[in-house]
């Protein structure tokens, strides 16, 4: 793992969390219980404090950063999709930020809300509970349905289960020269399917 102290502050990672070896955590970073931090994620706590609360996930290539005297927070069971950028914002409990979205300084995403992929949430935005946000700049288009929230929670559960699976079986290796016969397919732990 790539952990770096900065001006005396050392990242704090709960022993039940999983941080991929290619992720980078610098300085004032706090990672809670059961959190998943994916490959190539950058959590750079060299100005503001970065907090990832219990059960949340920060997926591949995500960036977290913020200004001095601010906290960038991903709330409990938060779900941050591949390539998202969080800068000085607060993501509420059980909220989802879609792939390649950008959430700017002082923005607050409400609990159980969903930010659609590729959205841009402006600095200072104040969201409410259970909003579907989309666009550039993002705006609330409607409430998150019960089915959508259930789908989000299944996806988050997959990442929470992935923590244990990674602790148990992920290790560096050399590639095979060819595919073996009857190569098995990996299975998830829930019945979640992609949204159509």
From Swiss-Prot:
The protein's superkingdom reads Bacteria
The UniProt entry's coiled-coil ranges are none
- Pathway, per UniProt? Amine and polyamine metabolism; carnitine metabolism
Which example biological process does GO assign this protein? carnitine metabolic process
Keywords associated with the record: Repeat, Transferase
Enumerate the residue ranges of region (Disordered).
177-196
What InterPro entries does the record tag this protein with? CaiE (IPR023446), Hexapep (IPR001451), Transf_Hexapept/Carb_Anhydrase (IPR050484), Trimer_LpxA-like_sf (IPR011004)
UniProt key word Cell division:
no
As one GO molecular function, the record gives:
transferase activity
What is the recorded function of this protein according to its Swiss-Prot or TrEMBL entry? Answer: Overproduction of CaiE stimulates the activity of CaiB and CaiD.
Q: Which HAMAP family match?
A: CaiE
Q: Which family does it belong to?
A: Belongs to the transferase hexapeptide repeat family.
Protein name as catalogued = Carnitine operon protein CaiE
Gene from which the chain derives = caiE
């Amino acid at each position: 793992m790539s952990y770096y102290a900065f001006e005396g502050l050392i990242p704090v990672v709960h022993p039940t969390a999983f941080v991929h070896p290619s992720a980078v955590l610098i300085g004032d970073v706090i990672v809670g219980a059961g959190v998943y931090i994916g490959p190539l994620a950058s959590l750079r706590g060299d100005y503001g404090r970065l907090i990832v609360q219990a059960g949340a996930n920060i997926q591949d290539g995500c960036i977290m950063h913020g200004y001095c005297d601010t906290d960038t927070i991903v709330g409990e069971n938060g779900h941050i999709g591949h390539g998202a950028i969080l800068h000085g914002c607060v993501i509420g409990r059980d909220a989802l930020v879609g792939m390649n979205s950008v959430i700017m300084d002082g923005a607050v995403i409400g609990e159980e809300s969903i930010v659609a992929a590729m959205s841009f949430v402006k600095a200072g935005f104040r969201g409410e509970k259970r909003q579907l946000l989309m666009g550039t700049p993002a705006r609330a288009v409607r409430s998150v349905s019960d089915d959508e929230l259930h789908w989000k929670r299944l996806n988050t559960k997959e990442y929470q289960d992935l923590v244990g699976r990674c602790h148990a079986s992920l290790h560096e290796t050399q590639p095979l020269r060819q595919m073996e016969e009857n190569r098995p397919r990996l299975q998830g732990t829930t019945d979640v399917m992609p949204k159509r």
